[in-house]
Amino acid sequence: MSTSSSAVSQLKNSPLAGNINYEPTVWSRADALKVNENDPTTTQPLVSADFPVMSDTVFIWDTMPLRELDGTVVSVNGWSVILTLTADRHPDDPQYLDANGRYDIKRDWEDRHGRARMCYWYSRTGKDWIFGGRVMAEGVSPTTREWAGTPILLNDKGDIDLYYTCVTPGAAVAKVRGRIVTSDQGVELKDFTQVKKLFEADGTYYQTEAQNSSWNFRDPSPFIDPNDGKLYMVFEGNVAGERGSHTVGAAELGPVPPGHEDVGGARFQVGCIGLAVAKDLSGEEWEILPPLVTAVGVNDQTERPHYVFQDGKYYLFTISHKFTYADGITGPDGVYGFVGEHLFGPYRPMNASGLVLGNPPEQPFQTYSHCVMPNGLVTSFIDSVPTEGEDYRIGGTEAPTVRILLKGDRSFVQEEYDYGYIPAMKDVQLS
């Protein structure tokens, strides 16, 4: 891990954040070569193929617990709340029937991203989730897809800011404000009617659609820096520049061993964890800052970045795929992490490689879209689990929760809990 200004120029002065002088931390190929998919301390337990499904009518994937700006997962009047990316299942739709008239769940599942909607669920137990419905009515969001973000409980009046991604056409970080109403019977999320687009990729720090038609720009996660008290946001991006124009230089290589100097087509993998700062705690105006971590020549996706603040350290987590790694290096689908003592870095890859929690090699696609909470619990969804022969079972439901122990720059897998167990760390009673 090193810092370099070769991929992204550093920022000298920010109108909103003040005098900032930092360079992105480079996740190098040498770091990634240390990834060990068979390390039991960073491997998620096997998910059984007889897993329960939380809904027969919808698929769910990215899960977003309701939280406060310091990361605390909250319940409201005793009700836990999660948001999920959601799409209807189509078992009777002729479009998803095979030649024998059987439901092709695999194709239905693979098509879900184009019809993703933000929905909510509630529970008294932190599991046994009850479906509440859509957060925004049809037509409220200005694009065809509602992709992942973060719901923030603002106060004890029940106001919620949902930061999310407006996708197709384009991709923009957006915010919509509503409120939560509870009763003895359940929960309603109401009045999420006015979406405000906050910013898009700028082409200077973050790659735009014009620079790369398969660019990544999504997954806002706002937080208050425990040191300076300002409101920031991390998000997924790609390092700016025309596709194929990036250089995998000495910093991006790192101290690789002999025989690993050839990077093939690694210049096409240009993932990064982006940063923005708000004008004030209202979160209405934002300024884009340079990336915190770049993965040029390593990986093209650093999805759903988010923080855990513990023991004076900044634990910055992200998720990524095996298929988005660059030529010559590999790693499992799962959680990757970086740790430092300051928001602006420098950061070090956790466990030397960056890998925190990966799928087991025998079930490489069992779970994804992990969210690490401040209590060490990690939630994810089930993608597909092998059954007999070459067959497998599609999930689209919550995976078993696991706990990880954070110890300095290292992490260790600990207990496994029930499917979709996302307990509140604090209950907020509405006034």
Curated annotation (Swiss-Prot):
<dbReference type="InterPro" id="IPR003469">
    <property type="entry name" value="Glyco_hydro_68"/>
</dbReference>
<dbReference type="GO" id="GO:0009758">
    <property type="term" value="P:carbohydrate utilization"/>
</dbReference>
<feature type="site" description="Transition state stabilizer">
    <location>
        <position position="219"/>
    </location>
</feature>
<protein>
    <recommendedName>
        <fullName>Levansucrase LscC</fullName>
        <ecNumber>2.4.1.10</ecNumber>
    </recommendedName>
</protein>
<dbReference type="InterPro" id="IPR023296">
    <property type="entry name" value="Glyco_hydro_beta-prop_sf"/>
</dbReference>
<keyword id="KW-0574">Periplasm</keyword>
<dbReference type="GO" id="GO:0050053">
    <property type="term" value="F:levansucrase activity"/>
</dbReference>
<dbReference type="Pfam" id="PF02435">
    <property type="entry name" value="Glyco_hydro_68"/>
</dbReference>
<comment type="function">
    <text>Catalyzes the synthesis of levan, a fructose polymer, by transferring the fructosyl moiety from sucrose to a growing acceptor molecule.</text>
</comment>
<feature type="binding site">
    <location>
        <position position="61"/>
    </location>
    <ligand>
        <name>sucrose</name>
    </ligand>
</feature>
<comment type="similarity">
    <text>Belongs to the glycosyl hydrolase 68 family.</text>
</comment>
<keyword id="KW-0808">Transferase</keyword>
<feature type="active site" description="Proton donor/acceptor">
    <location>
        <position position="303"/>
    </location>
</feature>
<keyword id="KW-0328">Glycosyltransferase</keyword>
<feature type="binding site">
    <location>
        <position position="62"/>
    </location>
    <ligand>
        <name>sucrose</name>
    </ligand>
</feature>
<feature type="binding site">
    <location>
        <position position="148"/>
    </location>
    <ligand>
        <name>sucrose</name>
    </ligand>
</feature>
<dbReference type="GO" id="GO:0042597">
    <property type="term" value="C:periplasmic space"/>
</dbReference>
<feature type="active site" description="Nucleophile">
    <location>
        <position position="62"/>
    </location>
</feature>
<feature type="binding site">
    <location>
        <position position="219"/>
    </location>
    <ligand>
        <name>sucrose</name>
    </ligand>
</feature>
<feature type="binding site">
    <location>
        <position position="218"/>
    </location>
    <ligand>
        <name>sucrose</name>
    </ligand>
</feature>
<keyword id="KW-0119">Carbohydrate metabolism</keyword>
